[in-house]
Structure formats: C-alpha cells, structure tokens
Swiss-Prot record:
Other comment: Specific for the alpha-anomer of the substrate.
Keyword Disulfide bond in record: no
Protein name according to UniProt: Fructose-1,6-bisphosphatase isozyme 2
Xref: SUPFAM superfamilies: Carbohydrate phosphatase
Cofactor mode of binding and number, as noted: Binds 3 Mg(2+) ions per subunit.
Outcome recorded upon mutating Q33R: Causes conformational change of N-terminal residues and decreased sensitivity towards AMP with lack of conversion to the inactive T-state in the presence of AMP
Organism placement in taxonomy: Eukaryota, Metazoa, Chordata, Craniata, Vertebrata
Pathway: Carbohydrate biosynthesis; gluconeogenesis
Keyword check for Cytoplasm: yes
Record region (Important for interaction with ALDOA): 3-10
Positions contributing to substrate binding: D122, N213, E214, G215, Y216, Y245, V246, G247, S248, M249, Y265, K275
Length: 339
C-alpha cells in the first residue's frame, strides 16, 4: 500500500517557471509580467475556442486582414485579448500583430522595454472544421533610445528574448523557450494553470515524416520537387516517408518537433518570396526548433539571420530534424549549381 497522493503538491506550473527564470536572470520582473500576461490571453483564447460554436464565434467577421486573409470572428476576439493583456503588463512599447496593418505603440503610461510580435490565431481557416489552431509570439528588447516605432520590431530572430506558441488541440499546450531549451506545458482545466509536462525537449536527428501542401506541386521549384520525390521513392530502397499536413502551421510544426521530420513552406512560382510572415510566424517557430536542436532555413540562410525590412515581410520556411533539413539544402545547392 502506498501513501502517495493522487494530487501533485509541488507541481511546476508555467507561472512558477516564469518567475523562477526571472529570478535566475536577476531581471527587473518586466519579462515575467509580460509572459504571465501573454499566458492569461492564451487561457482566454483557449476558452473562446472551446466555446466558439455555442457562442456563435464561427464564421467570417466581414473583413480582410492586412495580409489578405479573411478575418474570422475568433481572430478579432483573439487579437483584442492579446493586445489588451500584454499592454496591461506595463512591459511593452511596440506590438506587431498579423491582424493590424501598422505597429501598435503602447501608451506612455503603460510603456515598458519589450517588443512583442504575434499571430493571435494561426490556422484560422481551420476554425470552422474544428482542426487545431494556435497562437504564436516572439519577444524582443527595444534597442534604441528613441520614441517607440515600427523600426523597433525590425530585428532579426537572433535577438529574441523569449518565444513560444500555444496549440489549441485535444488539449491546450504551450511550447516556450527563454533561450535555454524548450519546455512544454499543458493546461490543466481543473487548476486553470499550465503544468510542465516535458522539460528540455529535443527534436530527433532524423524523422520519417514530411509535411507540405502538395496541392501546389505544379508551382514547386526543381529542388523541392526533387526532395519530395526522394521522400516518396527513396533511392536506397528504404521505406518512404509518411506525408502529414494539417494546414495549421502550429499543428504541423508541433508534430515535427515531437515526431521529427521536416516541415516545408518553400518559395514557389506563385509565392516567390514565400507565404509565411517572418516576424510573427517564422521567427518564433524557428527559434523553438533551433532551441530543440533542429534547423530552420529559408533555403538560402537560417531564418533567424534574416534582417527584416517590413513588419509583414514574407519568407520561405523549411524546418525540422537537422539531417532532414540538411538533405533538403543539399537538393537546393545541387540545383543551383546545375542552373
């Protein structure tokens, strides 16, 4: 007979984790406040996603966002939640959202030293069919002494202080990194808290899954076509890779992190500069994947090395297990040499 309690009495919640990280860094507490505010927004979005059908939050709000996507009602709600929560942390000066054409400058009385770039609801085209969706964010320090402006957000991903994503799937999960590896937290509905479920996650060196939208195959460049062919018909006679594609980037990236393999959204004839946005889609997930031991590239350089020129700039994105991404880059180099 055991006296072990069915309840954990010393659990590591995400709130506690963030406070401990802040204490170790001997910081001012601003980043701790900011992360806790972001987590509150994520909990609220998670609740809204679960209630969306009953609360009539499905469907289109009747507008198009700055990057050309139809805006769903949940998008609008999620965007407002993140903006209001992080500004009320008194730790931000500039916000960049997928849903807003211009950068949002925090009012002077609420201003702090951090810049937050976020996609409040990634994969929102999947809302109405109940597929997994998510929230993505990256946090930077303001580097100039000037008045806050859009320019403060135009930093390369190497400057990220913390980044993460929330996945609203069969459970709500947060993947977070503050530069010392990646930790995973699951929302416990009974507690209303995120609880640590996996510490210092590492991606496999090589996986068995490739993930991309093959509906665009007619637009692929030669390198992508060759790489996909190699995965389907391996030259060494080994088993082909499995194909998995949700169409919600957070879901596809998280599966790649957990199972290994490769996720591709390369440039193509239709989108020669890529489709995904650098600041609030590519940089945060590239940071997470690199912190987990993987690679993230545009096909020509590491994603985190790209110096942004505009807040809604698009880039190609290929990420995943290091050996898989390296094999893709070999195809790129081979085709460049032959052209």
């Amino acid at each position: 007979m055991t006296d072990r309690s069915p309840f954990e009495t010393d659990m590591l919640t995400l709130t506690r984790y963030v406070m401990e990280k802040g204490r170790q860094a001997k910081g001012t507490g601003e980043l701790t406040q900011l992360l806790n505010s972001m987590l509150t927004a994520i909990k609220a979005i998670s609740s809204a996603v679960r209630k969306a059908g009953l609360a009539h939050l499905y469907g289109i709000a009747g507008s198009v966002n700055v990057t050309g996507d139809e805006v769903k009602k949940l998008d609008v709600l999620s965007n407002s939640l993140v903006i209001n929560m992080v500004q009320s942390s008194y730790s931000t000066c500039v916000l960049v959202s997928e849903e807003n054409k211009d950068a949002i400058i925090t009012a002077k009385e609420k201003r702090g030293k951090y810049v937050v770039c976020f996609d409040p609801l990634d994969g929102s085209s999947n809302i109405d069919c109940l597929a997994s969706i998510g929230t993505i964010f990256a946090i930077y320090r303001k580097t100039s002494e000037d008045e806050p402006s859009e320019k403060d957000a135009l930093q390369c991903g190497r400057n990220i202080v913390a980044a993460g994503y929330a996945l609203y799937g069969s459970a709500t999960l947060v993947a977070l990194s503050t530069g010392q590896g990646v930790d995973l937290f699951m929302l416990d509905p009974a507690l209303g808290e995120f609880v640590l479920v996996e510490k210092d996650v590492k991606i496999k060196k090589k996986g068995k899954i490739y993930s991309l939208n093959e509906g665009y195959a007619k637009y692929f460049d030669a390198a992508t076509t060759e790489y996909v062919q190699k995965k389907k018909f391996p030259e060494d006679g080994s088993a082909p890779y499995g194909a998995r594609y949700v169409g919600s980037m957070v879901a596809d990236v998280h599966r790649t992190l957990v199972y290994g393999g490769i996720f591709l959204y390369p440039a193509n004839q239709k989108s020669p500069k890529g489709k995904l946005r650098l600041l609030y889609e590519c940089n945060p997930v590239a940071y997470i994947i690199e912190q987990a031991g993987g690679l993230a590239t545009t096909g020509t350089q590491p994603v985190l090395d790209v110096k942004p020129e505009a807040i809604h700039q698009r880039v190609p994105l290929i990420l995943g297990s290091p050996e898989d991404v390296q094999e893709y880059l070999t195809c790129v180099q081979k085709n460049q040499a032959g052209s």
